[in-house]
Amino acid sequence: MLELIAISEVNDALAEMVAFFRVELRSYKGLVSKPNVDVGREEMEEYLAAGFPVFAALVDDQYAGYVVCRVDSEVVWVESIFVKEEFRRHGVASALHSKAEEIAASYGDDTVYNYVHPNNHHMIEFLRKRGYTVLNLIEIRKPYKDEKLTQTITVGEHEFDY
């Protein structure tokens, strides 16, 4: 059975999921890394200290995923959403994302803003199926010193290093 719970403090299972989320994000940049549970715990503690709404999904009392929302001027952003591999394609992400939409609705809004890596094809497809088809903003920055950029992404007529 799937259950969503509000998170008020970090436990080991949640810290581990955050660590694996960071590993997955790095993989979109072609980087291989190992999960760092201490860093995952610290990241989640920062979200909670900042008052971000955080929810975890439990499936048969096992932690299956989580969503972190940021509310800024009554606009809801999904800061991160993660589902463990073995629980994917079972409605967990949909339930978590619906919770973010529920928060947005409580402010009178009918959309959630989502941060997505441009080559995170699974998340983009997930969002498209939920009706999220509008590209809102892109984030552009200078390369970091010694950063190795290995891909390019085209948006409209423009090509960007990634």
Where in this protein do the model-derived segments appear?
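A short beta-loop-alpha structural element at the N-terminal edge
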Residues: M1-A19
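Conserved GNAT-fold acetyl-CoA-binding loop/helix
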Residues: L2-I5, R22-M44
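A short helix-loop-beta-strand connector motif used in the catalytic cores of GNAT acetyltransferases and
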Residues: E42-A56, G65, W77
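Glycine-rich acetyl-CoA-binding "A-motif" of GNAT/NAT acetyltransferases
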Residues: Q62-G65, H122, V134
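A conserved beta-turn-beta hairpin within the catalytic core of GNAT-like acetyltransferases
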Residues: R70-E79, R88, L135
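Conserved acetyl-CoA-binding loop-helix of GNAT-fold acetyltransferases
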Residues: V83, R89-E102, H121, E125-K129
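Conserved GNAT acetyl-CoA-binding A-motif
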Residues: A104-V116
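Conserved beta-strand-loop-alpha-helix junction that forms the acyl-donor binding cleft
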Residues: N114-M123, K145
